[in-house]
Amino acid sequence: YEIKVLSDGRTPLISESTYAFTADQDYAHSIAYPRLTYDYAQLRAATQTKPINLKITASRNGGSPMTVTQTWQLRQINDCPTYIRSRRLQTNGIIKNETMNVAIITLAGFVNENHPSIPRILSEALATGEIDSFSGYQEGTDISVLRQLNAIWKVLEKKGIRYSSIDTTTGSSTGVQHVRLIEDTLSTRQANCVDGSALFASIAIKIGMDAYL
C-alpha cells in the first residue's frame, strides 16, 4: 500500500506526506496511520478554527491510485482534546469506534517550563524576601519546598490573576476544552483551574520540582 496526503493553500499546512507499508496478509481491509509532515509554525499560530482541504491518494500493489478529498477543521491552539475516538478494524471489515480519555496527556501539553515569562516571575518571587534562592528539593525539608511555592504564589496573587471559567470551544464539544496559554493567562489576568494549574506547574518544574496535573 502507498498513501499520500497533501493539504491545500499557498503554504500548505501539511506538505506531501507519503506512507508505504506491507500488510501481514492479503487482507481485504487495512487501517493506516501515516505520519503527516506539518508546518508547526502554522499550527502554533492558529488562533481561529478554520477548515482545510486534504487530498488523500491511496494505491495497492502498484495499481491505479484512488483519490479522496476531505475537509478537516484546523482547531485553534487553545483547543485541548480531552477525549478521542479510536478506530479498530475488526476481522469482518467493520471499523469499530472506541472513545478514550486522553486528558491526562493532552492537558500536560500546556505546561511549558521554558516559557520566557517564568524567569521574570522567579526574580519577582526572590524579591519578596520570602526565600533567598530556589533550591528545589535540595534542602530536604517540606518547609523549604512550601516556602518556595508560597513565594511564587504571592507573585501570581499580586499580579491580580482571577478565576474565569471560559472553557467553551469553537464548535463546542464535550471532548474539547479551551485552555489558555501561559502568555494569555498573564496578559488577561484570568485563569480557570486548568489554566492556573498549567502555569503553576510550569514554574514548579522550572525550579526542579515534580508537578502533576
For each of these PLM feature ranges, what is it?
Residues 1-87:
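Beta-strand-enriched, solvent-exposed domains that form extended recognition/catalytic surfaces
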Residues 48, 145, 196:
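Hydrophobic (often cysteine-bearing) scaffold residues that line and stabilize catalytic clefts
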Residues 56-60, 152-156, 160, 200, ...:
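Hydrophobic, Leu/Ile/Phe/Ala-enriched alpha-helical segments that form helix-helix packing faces
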Residues 83-97:
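Short, surface-exposed secondary-structure junctions/capping segments
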Residues 99-188:
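Secondary-structure boundary elements
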Residues 174-175, 194-213:
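Hydrophobic/aromatic-rich core segments of domains that either
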Residues 191:
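Long, structured stretches of catalytic cores involved in phosphate-ester chemistry, encompassing
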